[in-house]
Amino acid sequence: LRCKMLHNRFAGDKLKYLDQLYEGHVEMNGQIVCCKGVNDGKELERTMDDLSKYLPFMRSVSVVPAGITKYRDNLYPLELFTKEEAGEIIDMIESRQKKYYEEYGLHFMHASDEWYITAGRDFPEEERYDGYIQLENGVGMMRLFITEFTEALEQVKSNPGYLKMREEVKRTVTIATGKLTYATICSFAERMMEAFPGLQIHVFAIRNDFFGETITVSGLITGQDLTAQIKEYQENSRKHFVEKISDAKKFVDNIGSADKNVHGLGEDLIIPCN
């Protein structure tokens, strides 16, 4: 399967490295990039079962959907996963987590946040993320955000000066985010506005023109898209809170994407950005 996906007859040899790392008791973490019709279904089950043999030195594996950009000329015709298919993959992963946890004290196999959003399901409780070991692969980011936001809001409300602050806060802000997390961010904006009636929050979903509209995560929003799309709102907002923008240096081989840092965006929009 690996040889087929990478169009390289030697690609399967790389799996031997896992054996060597396991034999040397070297701690590992892995990721499965799931491609519809290629390595999902029975192939995904087999891959998960094969990787579980490297426990306990393989500490975690994330399962993420392949990102499908608009730059796919002459490439395999990948498709996006449907709501039902995302639910099936979540079920497949969660059905194995209990077994792993009982034997090793780790949930081991983790579905990325994107699966839960696509399937319209609630995110797992915090304990299931094993200390957010796969956070940088998009696993548990939303649960961590929910936890931190809720704790911070409750802390503010319990402050003796809250009632005075509630009356004094008069501000309009815009939160820019990717389309994937738009609904979730909107729900938290509503909670903030309930806590502070004088606070007006506009949540703006940035369309990804650079990579294509099928890329909806916040981490791949480029500066050029953010600047172009948010300018029309700047007359209504004094300050914009930018959730996350891409840094050109994070791309393979330092390929640029006309990105700007947060201060550069502020100069373009003629407003402060954080």
Located regions from the model:
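A short, acidic, amphipathic alpha-helical segment used as a generic capping/interface helix at domain edges
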Residues: T214-G266
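Conserved C-terminal portion of the radical SAM core fold
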Residues: K16-L75, E84-E114
